[in-house]
Amino acid sequence: MYTLFILSLLCVLVTFSECKYPTGPIYPHKPIYPIRPVRPDPCPAVCLILCHKGNIHDKNGCPICRCRPDECALPLKVGPCRARFPRYYFNFMRKRCEFFFWGGCLPNKNNFETIYDCQETCGYAERRYPYPYIKRTY
């Protein structure tokens, strides 16, 4: 019982870091390895797959994931109406913004008025890896 109290007291005293394992109060130079992660990964799984080359790191050395928003992975949707509004969408397979005529109703979020808006939102298409599901190591 006394041991359990000491262990729970140590757990309270441990300082946590976002990216590194915490260190204990008795031996500050030795890391304490938690049973489960301290925090979930700041980048969701889809971000880790779709992130482009050249991620940056914050002051603690944690990667800051700059990911393509979800709307960029949506398929082209012209809609059921018969108007012909010039629009752009991000072609996920080709990794670039492409022109299409939108019907005028029921769009999805992968529908941009200008190529600039498309590139700004889904951007870095020209600088992306040729295959998004292969993780390169440098």
From Swiss-Prot:
Might you report a single GO cellular component term? extracellular space
Single annotated GO MF? serine-type endopeptidase inhibitor activity
Which PROSITE patterns does this chain map to?
BPTI_KUNITZ_1 (PS00280), BPTI_KUNITZ_2 (PS50279)
Xref: Gene3D superfamilies: Antistasin, domain 1, Pancreatic trypsin inhibitor Kunitz domain
Compartments, as annotated in UniProt:
Secreted
What CDD domains does the entry give? Kunitz-type
Which Pfam families does this UniProt record tie to the protein?
Answer: Kunitz_BPTI
Q: Do you know which SUPFAM superfamilies this protein is assigned to?
A: BPTI-like (SSF57362), Leech antihemostatic proteins (SSF57262)
This protein is called what? BPTI/Kunitz domain-containing protein 1
Species of the source:
Margaritifera margaritifera
**Which classification does the entry list for the species?**
Eukaryota, Metazoa, Spiralia, Lophotrochozoa, Mollusca
